[in-house]
Amino acid sequence: MKRPDYRTLQALDAVIRERGFERAAQKLCITQSAVSQRIKQLENMFGQPLLVRTVPPRPTEQGQKLLALLRQVELLEEEWLGDEQTGSTPLLLSLAVNADSLATWLLPALAPVLADSPIRLNLQVEDETRTQERLRRGEVVGAVSIQHQALPSCLVDKLGALDYLFVSSKPFAEKYFPNGVTRSALLKAPVVAFDHLDDMHQAFLQQNFDLPPGSVPCHIVNSSEAFVQLARQGTTCCMIPHLQIEKELTSGELIDLTPGLFQRRMLYWHRFAPESRMMRKVTDALLDYGHKVLRQD
């Protein structure tokens, strides 16, 4: 059985995290040549490349598996060392989360853990359709995803759903939808997407108004909070989680353009198995809070 030296795994991890050999060497306080030698040693052990030497470097499929192994070992070390780590560097927890969860329920859910435990969060924001891939690649130890099926050697639990409403300001609705939200009116009304892969509004408009993808003008803005601001200032109509705009809907600052029509995204919490004590705390906090504020039906 091949048993890698974890110093070599840490070198591989550093090259990926620091996006290059030079910064990885600085992070590890060794020479760049030593980093290269450690990775070469690891590649010789497994008889295949573990890095695609692009800019920035990225792991091969086998490299991803080894990084996932390293994440698990780091968490299990925390489990075994327990109180002996008191006063040492806080444990780094890298989690992949979607922007809308981060803007609504995730931080309040994690607040008790952050208050009571010596951890450093590294929250990597990704679309909920792609967060699980970061777990697969070993970049994170947990992920909030819409995928319901667990990866090999991982656990999954249902968190609950975010319901997305198609909203705008009242002046925007009066300008673009004087006769109601119709297919022809939507062709002229600007919407907003998080990035070029964000297809939520396209799916909603296609399903309910038979509008093909790309048929409406669309801004690209990488911020959930900015969606709310754009809608409030009358710039766009957009899909926003109901949980994020309860006050604006109650006050009338924003209006639901299509009452009874919405997009539901069920969210799941994925993480490596077995769970360390710290990850169990994170899991309990996310599930407890998620079950309170997210839709469970």
Swiss-Prot record:
Protein name: HTH-type transcriptional regulator ArgP
Residue span(s) of domain HTH lysR-type: 4-60
Organism: Escherichia coli O7:K1 (strain IAI39 / ExPEC)
Gene3D superfamilies from the UniProt entry: 3.40.190.290, Winged helix-like DNA-binding domain superfamily/Winged helix DNA-binding domain
Annotation: DNA-binding region: 21-40
Family, similarity comment: Belongs to the LysR transcriptional regulatory family.
Keywords of the record: DNA-binding, Transcription, Transcription regulation
An example molecular function term from Gene Ontology annotations: DNA-binding transcription factor activity
Function in brief: Controls the transcription of genes involved in arginine and lysine metabolism.
Quaternary organization: Homodimer.
SUPFAM superfamilies for the chain: Periplasmic binding protein-like II (SSF53850), Winged helix' DNA-binding domain (SSF46785)
